[in-house]
Curated annotation (Swiss-Prot):
Gene3D superfamilies, per database record: Malic enzyme, N-terminal domain, NAD(P)-binding Rossmann-like Domain
Annotated SUPFAM superfamilies: Aminoacid dehydrogenase-like, N-terminal domain, NAD(P)-binding Rossmann-fold domains
This protein's GO CC annotations: cytosol
KW Coiled coil (keyword) present: no
CC cofactor note: Divalent metal cations. Prefers magnesium or manganese.
Gene (name only): maeA1
Active site per UniProt: Y101 (proton donor), K172 (proton acceptor)
Tagged with keyword Metal-binding: yes
Descriptive protein name: NAD-dependent malic enzyme 1
Binding site for a divalent metal cation: E243, D244, D267
Cofactor or coenzyme needed: Mg(2+); Mn(2+)
Gene Ontology MF terms: malate dehydrogenase (decarboxylating) (NAD+) activity; metal ion binding; NAD binding; oxaloacetate decarboxylase activity
Species annotation: Vibrio vulnificus (strain YJ016)
Reaction equations catalysed: (S)-malate + NAD(+) = pyruvate + CO2 + NADH; oxaloacetate + H(+) = pyruvate + CO2
Length: 562
């Protein structure tokens, strides 16, 4: 654990020091520091510990009634005193994660311009495309190692939010630090402002982004390319996480850059990794393998197809053929089951179509096969929702699945809560408590006939902080598919249900540091094995992970000149 006792030498003093969130201690500055840094009279007389500050901050937090007000309050602390912010969040991680990230962050993105207080990260506008290098040089953090970037076009299940999408990179990087121990000094949220096609945003006098229809096609690609090249010039070793890009751009960008730079797409690969890890744990708890499951997806976009491909890869690693694995995965979108010969399918969807030979004897009352048709005929053991369309896991669908599967695995993963395919209480009730449920957004435990059923949040926060920590620990040059698969396997080994046969599918968030370190070790080991990181011994790797794991504690300050 990186708990360095050495002093930090700081060139700032007075109001400038108090206005620097990474360095500000507020009332915790010692008497000696107050003299050295010209802070006397700028703070109340009492010197407090960080725990005393946390207690006051938590009291203030509890005084707010709405989740949005709580979100704004926490963001204000983050922009004032980052060490205090992360200590507060770590002390109350289960309570506050839904406030700093999903589901509350969705509303914060929709209202970004209305609740704006202070700039954070970088806004890289298409209008300023000739000055991207200068913009990157303006970043307040100089030693950047992790970047989360969005263009705001597909924010959660809420669509095009323009620069309002900045709330997602800010929230994601908060979790890199709170869950994965990555110092906030190493992080940078970025939004690529290429305009918006959201008429509400364009008509809103408060909207702060570039008022222009979205740039598309070759102009868009050239802009992203110039941005990537500028990042490579400024921070050549930084990990870039692509976040909430629209389907038409997400997969092409990933394919274009994954073998050129150290990057991944959390919506596609992070969601896939946490889902595969959760499914592996569920299968282990049931004494079966993932390769023995029949899996139906509702939602065949880049996220759904990314999960499907990761599941297929794990099935193949368990010993079945790629052809056999694909025959057990059924993708359903708004037009029904994806089948060979369907028009207008994207390349990544084409790889997941079902053969007519599989569906030739299926029964249906209409052209094509609906979700209910697929459940009746394919008889899935796993049902995964990534559609962003609420309520489509109906009672009829769930109970039809339950007819032929005594322990159905149901993952309605769409975010935010308002977009979930079915609420856990209904799924538990419809299956008389037999279903194993995990969701994308947080839900309270369900009580059914006197028994309590914990509802696990199958959230990417179990995965991406550990991936980032592993990449940083060995300075990996790429994020490979095999590294992501190792993250899934490491997560599965943390499952209380798989280990003990009881309890929740995933560990509680209070254990997220242990989970992230285990994932980091597995990811880093695979990076070394694949030659995308320098080789180090296992014990040295453990030390490197601990040394990179930042904790929110105040360091002693000594004054120095610029």
């Amino acid at each position: 654990m990186n708990n360095d006792k050495r002093p930090l030498y700081i060139p700032f003093a007075g109001p400038a020091l108090l206005s620097t969130p990474l360095l500000n201690k507020g009332s915790a500055f010692s008497a000696e520091e107050r003299i050295s840094f010209n802070l006397e009279g700028l703070l109340p007389e009492t010197t407090e510990t960080i725990q005393e500050q946390v207690e006051r901050a938590y009291m203030q937090y509890k005084a707010f009634e709405s989740d949005m007000d709580k979100h704004i309050y926490l963001r204000n602390i983050q922009d004032t005193n980052e060490t205090l912010f992360y200590r507060l969040v770590q002390n109350h991680i289960t309570e506050m994660m839904p406030i700093i990230y999903t589901p509350t962050v969705g509303a914060a993105c929709e209202n970004f311009s209305n609740i704006y207080r202070r700039g954070r990260g970088l806004f890289v506008s298409y209008a300023n495309r000739d000055r991207i290098d200068d913009i990157l040089n303006n970043a307040s953090n100089h030693n950047v190692k992790v970047i989360v970037v969005t263009d705001g076009e597909r924010i959660l299940g809420l669509g095009d939010q323009g620069i309002g999408g900045m709330g997602i990179p800010i929230g994601k990087l908060s979790l890199y630090t709170a869950c994965g121990g990555i110092s906030p000094a190493y992080t940078l949220p970025i939004v690529l402002d290429v305009g918006t096609n959201n008429p509400q945003r364009l008509a809103d006098p408060m909207y702060m982004g570039w008022r222009h229809p979205r740039i598309t096609g070759a102009d868009y690609d050239a802009f992203v390319e110039e941005f990537i090249q500028a990042v490579q010039r400024r921070w050549p070793d930084a990990l870039i996480q692509f976040e909430d890009f629209a389907q038409k751009n997400a997969m092409p960008l990933l394919e274009r850059y994954k073998n050129r730079i150290c990057c991944f797409n959390d919506d596609i690969q992070g969601t896939a990794a946490v889902t595969v890890g959760s499914l592996m744990a569920a299968c282990q708890a049931a004494g079966s393998k993932l390769s023995e499951q029949r899996i139906t997806f509702l939602g065949a976009g880049s996220a759904g197809c990314g999960i499907a491909e990761a599941i297929i890869a794990q099935m193949v690693s368990e010993g079945i053929s790629d052809k056999k694995a694909r025959s057990q995965v059924f993708m359903v979108d708004r037009w029904g089951l994806l089948q060979e010969g369907m028009p207008n399918l994207l390349d990544f969807q084409q790889r997941l179509v079902q053969k007519h030979s599989v569906t030739a004897k299926w029964e249906t009352e209409a052209n094509g096969f609906s979700l209910l048709d697929v459940v009746k005929n394919a008889k899935p053991t796993v049902l995964i929702g990534v559609s962003g369309a609420p309520g489509l896991f109906t009672q009829e669908v769930i109970q039809e699945m339950h007819k032929h599967c005594p322990r159905p695995i149901v993952f309605p993963l769409s975010n935010p809560t308002s977009r979930v395919e079915a609420v856990p209480a209904d799924i538990i009730r419809w299956t008389n408590g037999d279903a194993l449920v995990a969701t994308g957004s947080p839900f309270d435990p369900v009580i059914h006939e006197g028994k309590t059923y914990p509802i696990v949040q199958c959230n990417n926060s179990y995965i991406f902080p550990g991936i980032g920590l592993g990449v940083l620990a060995v300075n990996a040059k790429r994020v490979t598919d095999e590294m992501l698969m190792e993250s899934s396997r490491a997560l599965a080994t943390c499952s209380p249900l798989a280990i003990n046969g009881k309890g929740a599918l995933l560990p509680p968030l209070e254990e997220i540091h242990t989970v992230s370190k285990r994932i980091a070790y597995a990811v880093a080991k695979k990076a070394i094995e694949q030659g995308v990181a320098l080789e180090i011994a296992d014990d040295a790797l453990q030390v490197a992970i601990e040394q990179h794991f930042w904790q929110p504690v105040y360091r002693r300050y000594k004054r120095t000149a610029f």
